[in-house]
From Swiss-Prot:
Its cofactor is Zn(2+). Belongs to the universal ribosomal protein uS14 family. This is Small ribosomal subunit protein uS14. It comes from Neurospora crassa (strain ATCC 24698 / 74-OR23-1A / CBS 708.71 / DSM 1257 / FGSC 987). GO terms for biological process: cytoplasmic translation. Component of the ribosome, a large ribonucleoprotein complex responsible for the synthesis of proteins in the cell. The small ribosomal subunit (SSU) binds messenger RNAs (mRNAs) and translates the encoded message by selecting cognate aminoacyl-transfer RNA (tRNA) molecules. The large subunit (LSU) contains the ribosomal catalytic site termed the peptidyl transferase center (PTC), which catalyzes the formation of peptide bonds, thereby polymerizing the amino acids delivered by tRNAs into a polypeptide chain.
Length: 56
């Protein structure tokens, strides 16, 4: 069995491997709250555009 035939050999329908950022398709550091599905790096860039404000 070659590497190509083993890679993605099963469908990813649940778990961390099935989800990715809707902006950059990165899968780590994903913010899923409120249905955002954005990685934390993209969230920091787009937070003001989405409507989030920083409280201090």
């Amino acid at each position: 069995m070659s590497h190509e035939s083993v890679w993605n050999s099963r469908p990813r329908t649940y778990g961390k491997g099935s989800r990715s950022c809707r902006v950059c398709t990165h899968s780590a550091g994903l913010i899923r709250k409120y249905g955002l599905n954005i990685c934390r790096q993209c969230f920091r860039e787009k937070a003001n555009d989405i409507g989030f404000t920083k409280h201090r």
